[in-house]
Amino acid sequence: MISRHRVLVLGLGVSVVTTAPAQTLSPLETRIKAAVAANYDSAVRLLQRTVNIGSGTLNLAGVRGVGQAYRQELDKLGFTTRWASLPAALGRAGHLVAEWRGPRFATGGKRLLLIGHLDTVFEGQGQRFTRQDSVARGAGTADMKGGDVAMILALKALKQTGALDQIQVIVIMTGDEESAGRPLTVSRKDLLDAARKSDVALGFEGGDARTATIARRGASGWILTVKGRQGHSSAIFREGAGYGAIFEAARILNEFRERLSTQPYLTFNPGTIVGGTDVSFDSTAVSGTAASKTNIIAKHLIVQGDLRSLTPGQLDSARAVMKAVVATNLPGTTATISFDDGYPSMPPTDGNRAILSVFDQVSRDLGYPAIEALPPERRGAGDVSFVAPIIDAIDGLGVDGFGAHAPEEGVYLPSLKMAAERAAVLMLRLSRAPRPATSDR
């Protein structure tokens, strides 16, 4: 799930490699870089093939089809793969899980968890893969089939050079990142189980040449329900008639804005509102209907929105403010608010910063730009946030693209090579770093 502003506008084929001089690659790392280049064309073909499989979250067959295509690639590399099905009641396809333990993996080295996802926001009809020079367009090219393919390309280069023998890694590609199945304790169980057997998580959501993600805001939901006294509009505001549901909702939303809108990293958005005398609302589909007349005081209103925060404490504080605002009502009205726990936040930690430092050095050693942390407000929620409380994590290792969650979605194809090179060398270096004997997580 991508939500970020582009940091660099480029035609990635040339300009990114001139920003920083290469430092020192080992002979093995040099061979890894060459192996990525040798497999680039086949990776583009894999991207084309899987983009052309429609895989909106609720297209279960399509999600499984994309998963099968990637599973075949991982099978060829010697991974032990399985399809983790979910209960039918969740209405989700399941996840691809693949594991590898290299025969020369050093005991005590860092164990890696690689995270991708198979589903897209849009179904894909009318958004098939098209290519013009170094730019490809289509549903999922950037978010995040491009990142999945970059991950596979990196693993293939490690395998062909023998470096994969030094690595222990679990790959999880979820089938419902864009709309996670509920309850989350069920739909994210395989991801959490994998995290508990790992030391570092690497997320392959879209990235760019100069940034990576060490913090992501969490995303949760809320529903505001307001009731008023139905009556003739000529009596509105008078004792006995009151203010009506719509005026009370307007007051509440405006007070939310006044009290919360200036907090750093915190945002809230009322995405859908229906109100009147006769109201129906489907919170799952986020759609509803309303009917009334202009001379009737509205008796019912529903608002559904989201709330994004950087830390659990910030989320709790914001919810407390919202509850307090809702509890004090205009005459003749009542209101309630409920909250839905969605994607957790991923606060910045020293461990995440340490991974960023290694990634920065990898990028410069390969001749790419230095890497800095992307401001958390420029990144949406994602699966890596579920594992961040358990292990150190970094995200944004995927391809550089544009138009995510929009019909014009596309990717700069040379970034596929850049992402794979950087990920492969990063995996090798992290695997050689000893994991701490104790952890405060």
Task: Give, region by region, the residue ranges found by the protein language model.
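Active-site metal-coordination/substrate-binding segment of hydrolases
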Residues: 107-173, 179, 194, 407, ...
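Acidic/histidine-rich catalytic neighborhood of metal-dependent amide-processing enzymes
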Residues: 144-219, 275-285, 435
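Acidic-glycine-rich active-site phosphate/pyrophosphate-binding loop
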Residues: 118-132, 215-226, 361
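Bacterial N-terminal signal peptides that target proteins for export
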Residues: 1-9
